[in-house]
Amino acid sequence: MRRLRRLVHLVLLCPFSKGLQGRLPGLRVKYVLLVWLGIFVGSWMVYVHYSSYSELCRGHVCQVVICDQYQKGIISGSVCQDLCELQKVEWRTCLSSAPGQQVYSGLWQDKEVTIKCGIEEALNSKAWPDAVPRRELVLFDKPTRGTSIKEFREMTLSFLKANLGDLPSLPALVDQILLMADFNKDSRVSLAEAKSVWALLQRNEFLLLLSLQEKEHASRLLGYCGDLYLTESIPHGSWHGAVLLPALRPLLPSVLHRALQQWFGPAWPWRAKIAIGLLEFVEELFHGSYGTFYMCETTLANVGYTATYDFKMADLQQVAPEATVRRFLQGRHCEQSSDCIYGRDCRAPCDKLMRQCKGDLIQPNLAKVCELLRDYLLPGAPADLYEELGKQLRTCTTLSGLASQVEAHHSLVLSHLKTLLWREISNTNYS
């Protein structure tokens, strides 16, 4: 007990000499209060972190909900047996940034995977005591029993037209969806298979994964069970994903984000290679087989890359089809342009006479990406390249006008940027 008292005395009073303590007894009390205040603040931060973590990371809830519906025969999929019966899907690190969209790293069939599952309804257990039944009724309500395969095909085609636009390539995409639904290859689509695929199509990212499956820079879809799905893992996600826990990411200012990126990010030539991949991804989104797509949250959080520094889009949640963005914005009431926003940064002009948003976006994908690349590429750039690179990125960020009307200029600027970066790294080991 005496040793404990001595230790406390040393910790709390050591900074002051005995003479100073005698002359200034008030300082002793202030110092003790300061120490206890530090302990309180630290404890509060730990509590907030873990309460946020428990809210963000609820993969166990997701698995319980999905497996409950699988065992009832409501849903099916290529991963269901391994997930719910054989326990061969291993959940590892929580990567979620929002409670309603659960994201985990994992292992399946000896492959590193990313597990994604939405649990919006299941999280509302206080407001909805019957959360699981409500989820199956709302999310897995279509198609209904008795729907023919022809009706399901037409239903799927109509859904794709509404979300991607009326494109000649859509019937081929419907065939691909029906082929995926028949995961057990018995040449028929059961009601459970149809319900699962229909629920998956309601997930924006899943629809994007299907549309961009042939593209080099989107993650490959590996399997699903109900509306839970697995994609190939991106070995190196965004820089702050590796450095920070999800609950702390929104708390840091952008200046500190950039500083951390410099400290923990790859060397400049590797960053140049990743940037080239990001520019190629912008090309892939522009007038592809299934229309044009807009990036509506352009941040370093979405910049992922493989072990060989090839760019992979880490998150497609904020990439939206042109038809979806137009439908949301066109005719929407507005007083100013700031009222016409889809996602975080897809902005349309406001017709102040009609007080309605227009459907065309003001800033194209490339301008937003170049703004991002200024912070990503200019720090640490070779001295002989710095001025020209800065000039081209400034030109690129000033691309304006309606996103649908800048095609020629867009392509020219993008080509110049890619050429400049490739020229710098093409004759080195970094290429």
Curated annotation (Swiss-Prot):
Record GO cellular component, one term: endoplasmic reticulum membrane
Disulfides per UniProt: C57-C94, C62-C117
Transmembrane helix listed as a keyword: yes
Segments on the Cytoplasmic side according to the record's topology features: 1-30
Membrane topology label: Single-pass type II membrane protein
Main subcellular localisation: endoplasmic reticulum
SMART domains: PIP49_N
Membrane recorded as keyword: yes
Transmembrane residue ranges: 31-51
PANTHER family: DIVERGENT PROTEIN KINASE DOMAIN 1B (PTHR21093:SF3), DIVERGENT PROTEIN KINASE DOMAIN 1C-RELATED (PTHR21093)
UniProt-recorded name of the protein: Divergent protein kinase domain 1B
